[in-house]
A protein has these predicted regions:
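Ligand-binding loop in jelly-roll beta-barrel domains
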Residues: 74, 82-87, 118-121, 165-185, ...
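Loop-centered beta-sheet repeat module
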Residues: 139-185
Length: 327
């Protein structure tokens, strides 16, 4: 088992979905309205798998060798590729406390996006410009859309979206998303489409102060390429890895690492190597030990020890103000 686990995703069909998961990444999508590829998922609504075993089955079989000694309880992350042919509904997600108290869910939903592809002039909804009391009144008057904050984005932009943030993906975008393992969404506005709305629960959880602009992140030169730290939050960390040569890595048994490649390369470990292509995702088990990435750009997500990671980055002179996350 101690090898990188290349995952077969679960596909989620959506009215707003399209075909770019196939045309860009060669994925065997089920229809021309495929909105999401759940790349790494132990969520019961859609399980990813490796060599015929679902991720929960692999976790049950290998335990901490796979997840790590510091990753306990429910598998914490859900990683997706999203093809938005049309605007998604304006929505918001609860935090852990609300999700557990009201919905009986183990997690709320903090997330982060990376814009993988978009058209010139692309925009996202990322926040609102009024308080919740005003928002309730404006919704009743049919004027919610006047208070949505839209931000311009381009390929490569990263947005950190904590629970409570009003947000929506714009049309004709391809997005990488890392989030807590939750499928709980409260819709505020559906652009005139026939979709169930959740106004009261949305207003319960909206934090009108959340929003802003894409994260700057910090770039570090490392052996074999660069490491860009974009988000460091108690829910997850997100880094962009550019392997211009052979980049040595190592696990210490405490946590797994999840990679999604956006260009081609290979992963090498003691006993083997495996090529990855753009759009593929793989897990590095916590007990793997030394491995290396050779070639390509990848997004790396993991469940961090925030205090330890902040100390390591600060020692390297990193300005943590440029890194998204609540710490």
């Amino acid at each position: 088992m101690l090898k990188p686990l290349f995952m077969d995703p679960y596909f989620n069909e959506k009215d707003w979905g399209g075909t770019r998961l196939k045309s860009v990444y060669g994925k065997p999508i089920p229809s021309d309205h495929t909105g999401e590829s759940w790349e790494v998922s132990a969520h019961p609504m859609g399980l990813s798998a490796c060599e015929g075993k679902t991720l929960p089955e692999l976790i049950a079989e290998y335990g901490a060798q796979l997840t790590g000694t510091e990753v306990t309880g429910e598998f914490p992350l859900l990683i997706k590729l999203i093809d938005a042919r049309e605007w998604l509904s304006v929505q918001v997600h609860p935090d852990d406390a609300y999700a557990q108290r009201v919905e009986g869910d183990p997690y709320g939903k903090t997330e982060a996006w990376v814009v993988l592809d978009c058209e010139p002039g692309a925009q996202l909804v990322f926040g609102i410009d009024c308080d919740n009391e005003t928002l309730r009144s404006e919704i009743a008057q049919g004027r919610l859309d006047e208070h949505l904050v839209k931000v311009d984005v381009k390929v490569g932009d990263v947005l950190y979206i904590p629970a409570g943030t009003v947000h929506a993906i714009g049309a004709n975008m391809l997005i990488y998303e890392v989030q807590q393992s939750s499928d709980r969404t409260y819709r505020l506005y559906a652009w005139g489409r026939n979709a169930e709305l959740h106004i009261d629960k949305s207003l319960d959880v909206i934090d009108p102060k959340q929003g802003g602009k894409p994260m700057k992140g910090v770039k570090l030169a490392v052996e074999g390429g660069t490491r860009e730290v974009m988000v460091l939050d108690p829910c997850f960390a997100l880094e962009r890895i550019t392997a211009t040569g052979r980049m040595p890595m190592k696990t210490d048994g405490t946590r797994f690492y999840a990679y999604t490649a956006v260009s081609d390369g290979k992963v090498i470990w003691d006993g083997g190597e495996h090529a990855y292509r753009a759009g593929q995702s793989f897990l590095i088990p916590a007990a793997l030990g030394e491995y290396a990435l050779e070639g390509g750009v990848l997004y790396k997500s993991y469940y961090p020890n925030v205090e330890k990671t902040v100390a390591e980055l600060t020692a390297l002179g990193v300005d943590m103000a440029h890194v998204g996350g609540k710490r």
